[in-house]
Amino acid sequence: MERKNAWKSCDEAKLAQVNALCTDYIKFISDCKTERECVEESIRLAEAAGYKNLNDCIEAGTPLKAGDKVYANNMGKTIALFVVGTEPMEKGMHILGAHIDSPRIDVKQNPLYQDEDFALLDTHYYGGIKKYQWVALPLALHGVVAKKDGTVVNVVIGEDPSDPVLGISDLLIHLSGDQMAKTLSKAIEGEKLNLTVGSRPVMNAADDCKEPVKELILSMLKEKYDIEEEDFLSAELEIVPAGPARDYGLDRSMIMGYGHDDRVCSYTSLAAMLKVENPVHTSCCLLVDKEEVGSNGATGMHSRFFENIVAELIALTNASYSDLILRRCLKNSKMLSSDVSAAFDPNYPEVNERKNSAFCGRGFTFNKYTGARGKSGCNDANAEEIAYLRKVMDDAGVFFQTSELGKVDQGGGGTIAYILANLNMEVIDCGVPVLNMHAPWEVVSKIDVYETCRGYEAFLRAEK
């Protein structure tokens, strides 16, 4: 059952639509390299499309009716958007759920130090990275510094063409004999992922100044951001690849960028959501944090945020609220866990079983199950739900494929799917196939981005 190449369906009009969507996506992924930046931009786009802040409706006691659009912001790191459907909430929602955190390197709480004539920031990597991929690259610093007076300072260094970039040094090949004898996982140690931020001492330093290079960095941070060294204690600073996403390939058919996992599915979910008006079932787009580290914490999918905000929505759309209505709503809901899958790579065919692999250019892909080895830890979607989705996609003319995450016993992975499925709703993973997954620069096919957005929209509009 080989799936067709979706590019072959393109005429000039469709090609223009593909390029228009992907141009917008390239801007999004270039500008939004942290979960906070993704939420901020999502709110901007939602409000431009007529969405209201749900908290304002709650405080005012404003009832909601079919067609109303609202969003809920959770701590600046998670966002849920809703379009109220014509069916009662009790009948369930159609949910798109993606994550907006990506593998990266975080700055520690007490990070700045001087070693010989270099100033460096100590770090702790976040998520599953191949550490050796992050050395000798131009890197940028994104994040916030929260000060004791309550102000929050936004920091972005390394993105503007006039900005300096930062980096983590690697060992020269001439002295790398011992390093190269190690396995890849051990060649670069986590404690050696130290970010170089300067090498010039402060001018006219006093004779007793022991760390003049560090002092210059602190004086620059004070001048530009009005922050002190102590403010690092309440900072969230993320180290990410510097520079924008770009067209990839001589034919410009692909996109190389940081954070396709999972911002390509986050953006296509958001873009599909913003197109939906007056659905039958209430539509929901849920963009969450912390998936790469287990979905824990107040902004991860394990948080009660989602259930709480659905309860608030029910209270504003129903004459009366009960916990039973909430439970029925969740049970009757359907969800697409909008997450990427591993694309077949002809350079590494040995890790895939071709018949059940996702291919770039053949549309978005459904993963009936993820997990590892014997499907450990997976959400295994029901056959009836897959049949329902096949019909939805075929009726809408969406190019899709099905896949597993590599050969049996080769490895595996997981998503937020099982967390929502634990609420007894129908859930399946589906999204864009990705090359170089979890590398600093990942690759996706433009036609897959387009078909994924179409598939998500078809699901939200489905009447059953």
Q: PLM ranges: what are they?
A:
Residues 1-464:
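N-terminal hydrophobic/helix-forming segments and targeting peptides
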